[in-house]
Every structure is written in C-alpha cells, then in structure tokens.
Amino acid sequence: MTGLFSVQIDERCQKRLKQGYPWVFRSEVLNAKKAESLAPGSVVDFVRAKGDFVARGFYNPKPQLVGRVLTLTEKQPIEKFFIFHQIESALRFREKLFAEPFYRLIHAEGDGLPGLVIDRYGDVVVCQVNTAGMEALFPHVEAALKAFVEPKAIVLRNDTSAREQEGLTQEQKVVFGTLENPVVTITENGAQFQADVMTGQKTGWFFDQRDNRDWVASLAKDSAMLDVFCHSGGFGIQAAKAGATAVTFVDSSGPALQAAEKNALLNGVEKKCQFIEGKAFETMEKLRDMGQKFGLVSLDPPAFIKSRKDMAAGLKGYQKLAKLAAPLIESSGYLFIASCSHHADLKELTDHVAEGLATSGRSFQLIKTAGAAPDHPVHPFLPETGYLKALTFRFLD
C-alpha cells in the first residue's frame, strides 16, 4: 500500500494509460465524487475498479482534464529524486544537442513533467508552471535547477491562461538570485538576439523555430526576403546574416519591430533591413499592388486556431495567407509557412495552404515539412506536444 488516494478509472481509460496515453478526464473516473475532496495537484494512484494499480500521477478535481500520468511503475515514488532524475536526464540530452546554453530544457509532457516548461537563457532560467501538481513540486524543481544548472537567476513566468483552468493564480517574479537586466542576449545559429524574459512573449524567445530559421536562412541566400509576422526578427535577421540581399520585416506590433531593429543592429545587418508596421493581410496586399517580388516569403503567424470551434475560420486564414503570398514570390522562389495551432493536423494545413497557392495558376512543389527543434520533444501519444508544423513550398516557373 502506498498510502496515496486511489482514483478508480474505467476500462477504456485503463487501456489508454497502459498504451502510453498520459491524460485522464473526469468522465473516465468512477469515484469522481469522492475524489472532489482531493487538494488540486495531489499525487494519486490510478487503479482499476478492483484496486489494481495502473498508473501514478497528478489529480486536480477542478478542470475536466483531472489526471496527468507521471509513471506506470508502482514502485516509483513521486518526490525529490524523481524530479531530479527527469531534469538531469533532460539537461544531458540538451547538452548533446547544443554547444551553447540557450534552449528549452523541459517541454512538459514531452519530458515527462506535465505542465512544466523551462527555457534556459545561459545563466538565467525561466519557468512556467501550468499544473497544480507541478506547482506543489516546484520546490524540488528549483532545487534541481540549482544543483545541475547553477543559474544566477530563476524567473517564474506563471502568466498563462492554462493556470486559470487549474485554479492557479498568475504571477511573474524572480524566485532565486538576482536578475540585473530582464533583457538577456542569446546566440542562435550564429546570430545574436535580445530577449526580455519578464515581459516577452512566452518566456522571451521562441526556441521551437531554431532549426526552421536556419533552414529558411539557407534558402534566402542571394535573394530578397519578406518576413511577415516577424516579431523580433528571428527569421529575417538570420537570413540577412546568411547572405540574403535584403529583408523586409512586417509586424503589427510597434514594440516587436523596435526589438527587430535592435537585433538587426546587434548583428550588423541593419543596412539590409526594412521595417513595416502594419497588419499582415493588408500589408501583403499593398506589396502585391506595388509589384514587389521576393525570392522567399516567410509567414510565422500566431495561432489562428485556438480551439476546435476556430478550425474552419483558422484554416481559411492560412489559405488566404498563401493566396496573398503567391504573387509576391518570384520565379523559382519559396514560401515558408508555420502553424503553432495543434488542432489543425499536417494534412489539413497542407491542403489549405496548397489551395491558396493554387489560385496563382502556377506550378509548385512541397519540398519540406518540419516541426519544432529537438529540444521540444513530442510525447508519442499526445499530439498536442507536437503543435508546431512548418511547410516549405517551391514554385516551379
């Protein structure tokens, strides 16, 4: 006996957990009424109706997604050494991947720690805790980071909507050390960028697009590039540094464009760069009407599909982007388009983008599909962790 509360689950759920699926929903819990008394984030055993062990994990009676599996091993306690092992294992893997300490260290379920995201910015570590279970275990997370990473500062960016669903409050603070400046400098694919770890989007930088930025930069060499939804310039600046002749950056956010300009200066490519503040669709229409042409167009929009109900409208959004991009792309040029909407699968996205390009009457080919960089591992039974999809098309004229 473990002394943990036993959450009884139905046969369908038992089968899914044994096959590797890591989530339990309230409708699958046989003693849900009794489990309502559990403190959010309690460690529990998920068991058959007769009491046989199936899995161990977090339980939060507040949301519909009540359970998150941590282990299928009955003898595995969930405490300090479990957390230490998971974080050390993840760190060793990243150290094999990257020569410099700028990466996602923990990718939630993908690294076996549901609801925990940790990004490393050199000696500054930024954490997002999105489940009540990880909130309860965070002292062990902090201790593990101090032991293995030895950071100068640990920052909590607990400002996500996911926390509200778990009944958690939002907060941003430095929980360890001193953050002398919230703007840190990172290196990615040989370029340098500034990231604000306190107020920047996500934790300050989108590490997931690292490999895609390198790929796009290689295609843009000796060509003019249009970087739409450029944010702080990750795609376009790496392309300029890799040999693009000129880069036009477009974003609706003034502060994002200011950050992109600073990053262009930081990399010595400012003379190649033009910055346009404006809405993506309208700006692309204006550039089309002006007869502008580019060897490569990069589109990295925010999520168009935030829930299932947004699916049809969101897919049409990607289709329209592709339709607007086609006349901007010169002969034998390229379109790179990314989606961070996990609700749309790869085929749906590909079909709609291709339909948008087809309106040009030009022949084209799909030359690459990609996802996030390997520091964002995908849980094999949880497609939500493989949210990022990136397509590259080449025109054949």
How should these model regions be labeled?
Residues 246-251:
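Conserved SAM-binding motif I beta-strand of class I
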Residues 320, 334-397:
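C-terminal catalytic and target-recognition region of SAM-dependent MTase-like enzymes
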Residues 1-120:
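Non-catalytic accessory regions of SAM-dependent methyltransferases
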Residues 222-231:
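Conserved class I S-adenosyl-L-methionine
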